[in-house]
UniProtKB/Swiss-Prot annotation:
Keywords: cGMP, Cytoplasm, Nucleus. This is Probable cGMP 3',5'-cyclic phosphodiesterase subunit delta. One of its GO terms (cellular component) is cytoplasm. It holds the Pfam family GMP_PDE_delta. It is found in: Nucleus; Cytoplasm. GO terms for biological process: sensory perception of light stimulus. The gene is PrBP. Interacts with Pde6. It comes from the Eukaryota. The lineage of its organism: Eukaryota, Metazoa, Ecdysozoa, Arthropoda, Hexapoda. Belongs to the PDE6D/unc-119 family. InterPro entries: Ig_E-set, PDED_dom, PDED_dom_sf, Rhodop-sen_GMP-Pdiesterase_dsu.
Amino acid sequence: MGSDDQSAADKIQKGFQINYMILRDADSGKIIWQENKDFSAPDVEHEARVPVKILDMRAVSREINFSTVESMENFRLDQKVLFKGRIMEEWFFEMGFVGASTTNTWQSTIEAAPESQMMPAKVLNGNVTIQTSFYDNETLITKSVVRLYYI
């Protein structure tokens, strides 16, 4: 990454903030979990306490509300689900252009793995991290790590 790319990434990162995150049952629309917290801080391992019933859902809708000072040409994210540090799943999401000085809501649906591939909550509890890397094109803006606890 050249110094121009790095300075652009620094400007975007300084003006980028997650305002809240919501997880819903994708079938009913009912809120399962909500947190009004900035999960975008890169040097912190965040924690989320999520109801165990989320593991029984066919699909989960994730809503991220974020604000940005700088515009982004192609906002996207790479999300990895890790169990004890090993990648179990990886998803790629692309939002596209994001205007400067805006607040945006991005909703995406994540379908559950087949039941035969699911592990019990007691095994997953505290051992799962979600690593989300936010990009503008190929420029990394920030990386968020959230450790999951099932309640």
